[in-house]
A protein has these predicted regions:
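C-terminal region of N-terminal signal peptides and the immediate post-cleavage residues
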Residues: 24-39
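Active-site acidic/histidine clusters and adjacent loop/turn architecture
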Residues: 116-161
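A mature extracytoplasmic/lumenal domain signature
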Residues: 99, 111, 170-172, 199-201, ...
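Extended, low-complexity, intrinsically disordered C-terminal regulatory tails
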Residues: 155-181
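Surface-exposed patches in mature extracellular/periplasmic domains of secreted proteins
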Residues: 65-72, 95-98, 163-172, 216-223
Length: 246
């Protein structure tokens, strides 16, 4: 199902809960690295494996700028199928919207043995003060899962930008560290669902534009020294694209 509602600085947004993804309670899928897919999934399928599939294709939410996101609900609907097709096209796979062995193998190629993704590491998302995921607005386990979900969207963004390296300057922030730097009191960084990005050689405006297709519901304006992205709608918050649709 797709919902279509109407590394170093401060998130301005404010953040309420939506089905399947929560602000206070966990956003956990219970997955580990090298996910053990046991079946081909098609539209109409349900289950934990569908949830994991949705997490991994969430960055393929739209073809053009759109307040659309892949719902992480374990229900393989049209939005999930469309995201699978976009993923397949991007990686040179047969485009059929069916998550079979070839698609699953490519999805698993995007993960590392520790559960992070191919081009992003847990350390990039650690609180810059404590070096861990403790002290936020949710548990460390929830922060880690939120960061993992962000990584898969960032993998999609990286692919859409031509496989250029993306540096995460700021990921999760503890409440204490966020206060030290003057961050917003309910910053998405406190939940592990936000990242401030630096993409050398690529204009922030271009990063912003590509991020508009990746299911990011929070985008800070692009005319600053980084590009902020977050998934606040996954926590029930309203969409916020500071520079609008470009």
């Amino acid at each position: 199902m797709t919902f279509s509602p109407n590394r170093r600085t401060i998130l301005r947004g404010t953040l309420a809960a939506t089905a399947g993804v929560l602000a206070g309670p966990v956003l956990l899928s219970g997955s580990a690295s090298a996910y053990n897919w046991t079946r081909t999934m098609n539209e109409g399928a349900t289950g934990a494996d569908v949830t994991e599939l949705q997490i991994r294709v969430a960055g393929w939410a739209a073809d053009s700028a759109s307040h659309s996101r892949v719902s992480i609900d374990g229900d393989f609907g049209p939005g999930t199928a469309a995201a699978v097709r976009r993923f397949q096209a991007a990686y040179g796979l047969s485009v059929d919207g069916s998550a079979g062995p070839a698609t699953q193998a490519q999805l698993n190629a995007l993960e590392q043995s520790d559960g992070s993704t191919a081009h992003f590491n847990w350390s990039e998302f650690y609180d810059r003060s404590s070096g861990n995921f403790n002290g936020g607005k949710v548990s460390a386990a929830t922060v880690k899962e939120n960061a993992r979900r962000a990584m898969y969207k960032l993998e999609a963004l990286r692919k859409k930008l031509g496989n250029v390296p993306i540096t995460v300057n700021s990921g999760f922030r503890s409440i204490a560290h966020n206060a030290e730097i003057g961050g917003a009191s309910d910053s998405m960084h406190l939940y592990g669902t936000a990242a401030d990005l630096d993409v050398p050689g690529v204009a922030n405006r271009t990063v912003y534009q590509k991020a508009e297709t990746c299911g990011f519901s929070g985008l800070e304006r692009y005319d600053v020294d980084h590009q902020h992205v977050d998934s606040r709608a996954d926590l029930g918050r309203a969409w916020w694209w500071e520079s609008g649709t470009i």
